[in-house]
Amino acid sequence: MAVGKNKGTSKGGKKGSKKKVVDPFTRKDWYDVKAPNMFSNRQVGKTLVNRTQGTRIASDGLKGRVFEVSLADLQNDTDAERSFRKFKLIAEDVHGRNVLCNFHGMDLTTDKLRSMVKKWQTLIECSVDVKTTDGYLLRVFCIGFTIKDSVSQRKTCYAQHSQIKEIRRKMTTIITRDVTSSDLKEVVNKLLPDSIAKDIEKSCQGIYPLHDVYIRKVKVLKKPRFDLANLLELHGDGGGKGAEVSTGAAEGGVTIDRPEGYEPPVQESV
């Protein structure tokens, strides 16, 4: 054993070991994430952001955040038909402690997509770029599968190439018709029950019977210039649950009645 002093222990350990550890969460604030009034449950959840310090404004750090929420959570529903749809909401503005979101896309869960792909059938897909009446450019993906006819004795149900082309053309026509004649809010209302996919399945029965027809994905490629009035209209009173956003609070604050001679309490520290 070497004889001598241990320099590290004699000086009290490493340099900087007595530095005070500050919890980073003390510098952050919680904000409520609000969904548009197309959904039943307006209170999506909460999100963290650093407090405003100098030129770093908290609201700037929140704008542009994308939240992915299951449709079952947005509709307060435990139905399995809703749980595999995921809606993306993007934060567009901040009012007080509320983060106002707008529709940013839709997708199906991976396990649902994998469970639909099977042998002895034909998978048919299509994608269409369509523009809504209020200027949103969307890319809509549709998926469907062939199914055996009730009188067929075959093991397989493969469609011919000409039938696949005809079904894909029918998908494109119905999606273009339903989206181009609607604004973004109406498109989302059609995506909630998936009425577009049901129309496709019904209209393609004469070409080849289909099942498991879904709008697989919706992407927002381009959006018009940000309009605060339109966003506040989306977050107005729509019968949804949760705290609604008041337009008066957004524009000039809320008027609170105070008794005469009221004085605010003196704070000990700022």
From Swiss-Prot:
Localization (cell): Cytoplasm
GO biological process terms, semicolon-separated: translation
Keywords: Cytoplasm, Ribonucleoprotein, Ribosomal protein
GO cellular component, one term: cytosolic small ribosomal subunit
Annotated PROSITE patterns: RIBOSOMAL_S3AE (PS01191)
InterPro entries per record: Ribosomal_eS1, Ribosomal_eS1_CS, Ribosomal_eS1_euk
Region (Disordered): 1-21, 238-270
Pfam families: Ribosomal_S3Ae
MF annotations from Gene Ontology: structural constituent of ribosome
Family: Belongs to the eukaryotic ribosomal protein eS1 family.
PANTHER family: 40S RIBOSOMAL PROTEIN S3A
Subunit record text: Component of the small ribosomal subunit. Mature ribosomes consist of a small (40S) and a large (60S) subunit. The 40S subunit contains about 33 different proteins and 1 molecule of RNA (18S). The 60S subunit contains about 49 different proteins and 3 molecules of RNA (28S, 5.8S and 5S).
Name of this protein: Small ribosomal subunit protein eS1
